[in-house]
Amino acid sequence: MLVALGVILGGGYVLTAPPSGFSSQDVVIARGASVFAVAQELADAHIIAYPMALRIVLRIEGNENRIRAGTYRFVTSENLLAVCDRLVTGAYGIPPVRITFFEGTTVREMAARVAAAFPGISAADFSAAGHPYEGYLFPDTYLFSTSADAASIVAAMRANFNAKIQSLSGEIQASGHSLSDIVIMASLVEKEARSSGAKRMVAGILWNRLQRGMPLQVDSVFGYIYGRSTYAPSLADLRVNSPYNTYLHKGLPPGPIDNPGLDSLEAAANPAKTNYLYYLTGTDGRMHYAMTYAEHEANRRKYLP
């Protein structure tokens, strides 16, 4: 090693200079590839001249195991030290993919967006990686490397959720509900109401119904049951044998029906305190609340003619 280091230091520009025969290209560094494989691949692509020189520089810097996988774009020839720096910092040279997931998006819907933005990721791959975390993939705008895979995208979204939920830790603890129940409730609220005030009202009503042992009777679960963005349930649907059918089964559904935003999570943790047990959205676009079924029916006749 000392002899090799001396050769590199003595050779100076000769050993660190880019090779002849360079052409603009993309080079894919596979996840888990050894420093030997990476060095040889770059040499074969005429990005570097001497594989051993790259290995020695990375070893001297303590970066042999810090090479970042992904697709690197080389537009102009670069010296060895610049190439080493790019490998370690993940400077891919390719504009990142910008992708936005809206509040209330399901993993199934996210998978379609990811597949459209990343040719190398199928909707099935993303669904498999993301489905166990339905409700915990925070809806937001993200920037990802073009070489990102389903697992890394899911990991970034989960990390964002964990960071965002910290702002509600006190409210969640004070609510007396588990994080799991809060997320499930928030996913229902996300689909049932739009404004912050309405979300807090709906959350309060649904918690009230749970406390009284009443079925939640939330219509939005049927979109999740049937895998559709929107769905108006029929009388037959109200009897469909699904654990997510909140007409047929009391209590919260077994899991979230979408990935809620922070507004809905906050509403679930800190709902409005009322005696209401019913709500509906009228043709006037407003929500109307009732304490009794008779009042609810009156609202139905008045606002849903």
Give the residues covered by each predicted segment.
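Signal peptide-directed extracytoplasmic domains
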Residues: 17-167
